[in-house]
Amino acid sequence: MRRPRLLLLLTAVLWGHVGLASAETDEPRRNVFDDPFQQLTRGQPNCPVPPGPMLTEADAKAQAHGRIERGTSCYRAGRCRLPNSYLYDKEIMPRVQKAVDADGRFGSTTSVWALGQRRWIWLQGCVGSEAESTALESLVRGIDDVEGVVNELKVVP
């Protein structure tokens, strides 16, 4: 049980370091790996847009090998029906949007973006309370094919 939590922590730390290293350069950024990234709610107009999957070429090269290994490991282990876990992301993201819209609790008080990578969903943006943050994470975690959720939401009352 401790391994998934350790993996989650290490992944979050890695992404934080990659983002910080990239923030210091003026290199052009793009969504090199075509990871789905979309705004789910728009209730806090002053919430800044998160960087999402925008990478420099150097960042993309640094991540490429690890993405290949992580992408195919779930299929080799028999946990995925598709040969690469990144193939799920474009199927999952519409379900995330649909679940948030159908729930109805978050539209007027949050501005949230979702980033999908290898069956994991990163929630980024602003919520009105810790309870909203927890409820949104729980909602997304319950969606089919979602393996994990990284909650990077900031509480902005």
Sequence positions of predicted segments:
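N-terminal targeting leaders
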Residues: 2-157
